Amino acid sequence: METEIWKYIDELAKRIKRIIIVFIASLLAFLAIPSPSPFGIKGSSILFYDTLIFWIIRKMEEAYLPPDSKLIVISVTAPLFAILQMAFYLSLIIAIPVAFREIYAFVSPALYRREKAIIKKYLLPFSLLYLTGMIYTIIIVLPLTFRALIFLYYHLNIELFINLNDFINIVILMVILGGLLFALPTLVLPLIEAGILGTRTLSKNRIFIYLIIAFIASLISPDPTFLSVIPLLIPIYALYEATIYFGRIIEKKHSKVS
């Protein structure tokens, strides 16, 4: 018995080690990978080597902020922390799929064949919906969010200065949130298929769940008017209703089989 426990602990340690290695390798790679024009900013000197992280931050600034706004830092070390922060988030995005794969490989021997089939069935839809949510947030939600915020500042006649670290946090967290919220159906439908959750519960608590989703989105969004969050909530609520619809189909199939 004790030997079996240590065997599982050793297996778990190996899989955690793989996740950490992927994360650290991604972190170092993002800090070292050159931008599309690595010496195109201030000359050809190695002192002005331009990394992919710098390039991404500049593109974010160009996409979401007006030309007369300024990104500021409040300490000497803030730019360094901003670079590490961006590299950390990007590395996390790379490491998360690896973590899911390793977790599944660890627990799969204890799962029944039907449970394995359910998990495998929703892996691709989860990835596609998560990616769609991130792209939708980048293209639609974030521009509207910053436009609403800037509109408010201009009408109050306030000059716009945005903290670099806050800017990165807002963008990355909203992108991750958008991806996760879009992927919710692929997390709920397996629970319905496994008989753990029912569509009646989802229908009964619909308003409460809508309010929770809206509250979480408003916490991350910097827009105090809440208007820019609406384009994110509309497709998510539509996906929630679609989840209930397909969940009922699954329940009917199960009732016929039984």
Q: What would you call each of these model-derived segments?
A:
Residues 1-258:
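Membrane topogenic/interface segments and analogous intrinsically disordered interaction regions
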